């Protein structure tokens, strides 16, 4: 049997877990001396409450190889194949943990760790498509080839409402964050080839949201795509972004999701983004 596993730095729509048989191994969220399993011991709202209360951004850590081994044994039976699809290895050690765990359980399961080169709902979309291909009769090799082909063509573009959370998490320097706040500058970040880079800075939120659409539009033009809006505690902006994006793309499906805690911890509330996922 084919099992599909992703980590908590990815997102799926609530119904996908049961509909497509996707299992999620939690990320560890560290507040001070306490550790919480994302989605098990702390949800998104609980996370933001703690951030508001303590004015500190928690640290996040990938599942350990031991946690992976325990998780694989929990969700699979001897002889199963496990596609283990994870957040870009350039931003996290999760993929490395999965590789180590795969070696440990190689006599029990055929684990295939995959670096998605993506995050958030990009990982979820890969997992969903993998299950669809399996149900269509495709082999494991064909499914892996599909993932390896599409993962570098999907694009994620984000705008941060503030650099304060990135500063607290150590992603940007204090001076940069202070200057951006004073000038009301909104940074634009693009996830490309597994790397997340700040590519532009604009002066208003409205201009930033426009660029989140314009940047991938320049690349995809009229190609058929899936659109996925992302937001961190700002569903209104996420919905507005998605509705505007629909006017500019040849989309076949559109959806919206909260940003995973593991991602939101580094980017902060008010972050809004768009994933453009190619269909050909």
Question: How would you name each of these model-derived features?
Answer:
Residues 38, 42, 63-66, 117, ...:
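Residues at secondary-structure transition points
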Residues 48-64, 192-206:
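Acidic/glycine-enriched edge-of-secondary-structure segments
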Residues 3-62:
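N-terminal glycine-rich anion-binding loop in soluble enzyme alpha/beta folds
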Residues 44-48, 77, 99-104:
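A short glycine/small-residue-enriched secondary-structure motif
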Residues 1, 78-81, 250:
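Short loop/turn motifs at secondary-structure junctions
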Residues 3, 9-23, 28-30, 90-104, ...:
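Mixed-charge interfacial surface used for oligomerization/domain docking
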Residues 1, 58-59, 85, 117, ...:
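Short, contiguous strand/loop micro-motifs
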Residues 53-56, 62-89, 96, 100, ...:
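Glycine-rich phosphate- or other oxyanion-binding loops that anchor nucleotides, phosphorylated ligands
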């Amino acid at each position: 049997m084919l099992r599909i596993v992703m980590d908590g730095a990815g997102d799926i729509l609530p119904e996908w877990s049961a509909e497509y048989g996707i299992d999620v191994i939690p990320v560890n969220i560290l507040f001070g001396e306490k550790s919480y399993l994302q989605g098990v011991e702390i949800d998104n709202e609980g996370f933001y409450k703690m951030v508001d209360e303590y004015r500190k951004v928690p640290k996040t850590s990938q599942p350990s190889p031991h946690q992976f081994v325990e998780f694989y044994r929990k969700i699979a039976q001897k002889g199963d194949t496990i596609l283990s699809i994870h957040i870009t290895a350039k931003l996290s050690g999760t993929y490395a943990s999965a590789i180590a765990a795969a070696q440990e359980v190689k006599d029990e399961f055929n684990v295939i760790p995959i670096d998605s080169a993506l995050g958030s709902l990009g990982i979820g979309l890969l997992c969903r498509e993998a299950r669809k291909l399996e149900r269509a009769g495709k082999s494991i090799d064909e499914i892996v080839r599909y993932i390896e082909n599409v993962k570098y063509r999907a694009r994620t573009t984000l705008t941060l409402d503030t650099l304060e959370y990135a500063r607290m998490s150590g992603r940007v320097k204090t001076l940069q964050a202070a200057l951006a706040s004073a000038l009301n500058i909104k940074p634009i970040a693009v996830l490309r080839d597994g790397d997340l880079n700040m590519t532009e800075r604009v002066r208003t939120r409205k201009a930033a949201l426009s660029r989140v659409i314009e940047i991938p539009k320049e690349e995809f033009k009229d190609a058929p795509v899936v659109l996925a809006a992302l937001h961190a505690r700002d569903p209104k902006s996420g919905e507005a972004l998605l509705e505007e994006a629909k006017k500019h793309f040849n989309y076949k499906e559109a959806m919206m999701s909260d940003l995973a805690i593991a991602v939101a911890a580094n980017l902060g509330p008010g972050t809004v983004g768009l994933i453009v996922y190619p269909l050909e």
